[in-house]
């Protein structure tokens, strides 16, 4: 469901409509919301969005939402953000307490150590670019929101179940990413838990 006349609390708290005023389409024309207990999020030609197709499970990000909070799905690359030097993360999922940037590499094959490293390096760069954009936008004088203090921010690289995992490389990349990005966590987990209770129905 695309929301156009209601601003979710998670969006209001971060003043995202003001921070990205003038963007076309705007925040409210991009987002989807759901209070389902399990939310399948994918990225394809339509951008990052909610899917109801169980065939997408092998390549999706699964948001687990036991308290039925209002979860926001925001497509970024080529949707809200048309172009940015350094690239852009595919999208984000968030509620009032947690904000997660997503970069999908679900079509990557990872058929060599070099290919795996290249996939992860490009994805982490795109996530870092998105993170810095939000930090900068929300820190402007007219917004005055400390993004990293307002919500629990993390970044996730999503690969398909067939992609070969490299635990040592992933650990090194986690450490490097955290050092270069104000302590923000980089994760390779496809499942994201939203378990805080929020006043999702407040307007």
Regions found by a protein language model. Give the residues of each.
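Catalytic micro-motifs at enzyme active sites that drive phosphoryl/nucleotidyl and oxygen chemistry
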Residues: 77-83, 88-90, 140-145
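Catalytic cores of nucleic-acid endonucleases
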Residues: 114-158
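Short acidic, S/G/P-rich loop/turn micro-motifs used as interaction or catalytic elements
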Residues: 79-83, 107-110, 162-166
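Short, conserved catalytic or adaptor-binding loops enriched in Gly and charged residues
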Residues: 63-64, 147-148, 177-181
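Conserved catalytic cores of phosphodiester-cleaving nucleases, focusing on short active-site segments
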Residues: 91-93, 98-109
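Short, low-complexity, polybasic intrinsically disordered segments
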Residues: 155-203
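Catalytic centers of nucleases
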Residues: 84-93, 119, 123
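Basic, amphipathic N-terminal segments that precede the first structured/catalytic domain
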Residues: 1-84
